[in-house]
Design a protein with these regions (language model features):
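Glycine-rich, aromatic-bearing surface loops/beta-hairpins
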Residues: 128-208
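A short acidic/basic microdomain associated with nuclease active sites
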Residues: 30, 48-78
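Interdomain/boundary linker segments immediately adjacent to catalytic/signaling cores
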Residues: 1-31
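Nuclease catalytic cores
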Residues: 33-37, 41
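Catalytic cores of nucleic-acid endonucleases
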Residues: 83-149
Length: 208
């Protein structure tokens, strides 16, 4: 890929720091997780643009595409297994059809056996064809507030079930980011623990 680990880890720390600095306990419960994801995505895409990558919103999904147009990177919140070499990490929140199609595209290029079919048939109007040949890597991040660290890995998903990754072909464990030197990232009782490490999650309820 031609990227150094710091090109991926540093923006994530900066994004997390920015989200924490702007946090207010009066905001909706989902806003903090969304802010973390949004700030990390913004900082990451800004850094990768400097290195010749191009930011795109593919079907409204924010991605950075490599200079040769063969691969993309997506920042996604992970669970507590993130960046554990012997772990089995998953994305923290379920993902939709766009992500499922990206995983299916990865699987087509992979020789590893799979157990499910990810792609959803969106019909003739599907706009994914322009990016169908991209190999999409996931920059998985997890803020461990107990250890006061940010764990990250850059991994290639090739199977998923109901919006969650169930199989990775390759996982690159990135250096753990010690947050003890960032005083504004220290644990705060006012920061909702369940929102701290997640992407945004919406629940739709029918109202009669």
């Amino acid at each position: 890929m031609g990227l150094s680990p710091s090109s991926l880890t540093r923006p994530c720390v900066e994004g997390l720091q920015s989200a924490v600095a702007g946090y207010s306990p009066f905001e909706p419960a989902i806003s903090f997780g969304f802010s973390i994801w949004s700030k990390i995505v913004g900082a990451l895409r800004k850094q990768l643009d400097k290195e010749g990558w191009k930011h795109h919103d593919i079907a409204n999904a924010p991605r950075s595409v490599s200079p040769d147009g063969t691969m993309a990177i997506a920042a996604v919140g992970g669970d507590s297994q993130t960046a554990h070499a012997d772990g089995d990490p998953r994305n923290a929140r379920t993902k939709g059809p766009r992500f499922a199609n990206e995983v299916e595209n990865n699987a087509v290029k992979s020789g590893a056996p799979r157990y499910t079919q990810c792609r959803l048939d969106l019909g003739a109007g599907d706009e994914d064809t322009a990016f169908a040949n991209l190999q999409t890597w996931v920059l998985l991040y997890f803020w461990d507030r107990t250890r006061n660290e940010l764990r990250l890995e850059l991994s290639l998903p090739i199977d998923c079930d109901k919006g969650f990754v169930t199989q990775w072909e390759t996982r690159f464990i990135l250096p753990v980011q010690d947050l003890s030197g960032h005083t504004d990232l220290s644990s705060d009782d006012d920061v909702r623990p369940y929102a701290a490490t997640q992407d945004v999650d919406f629940e739709i309820t029918a109202i009669s």
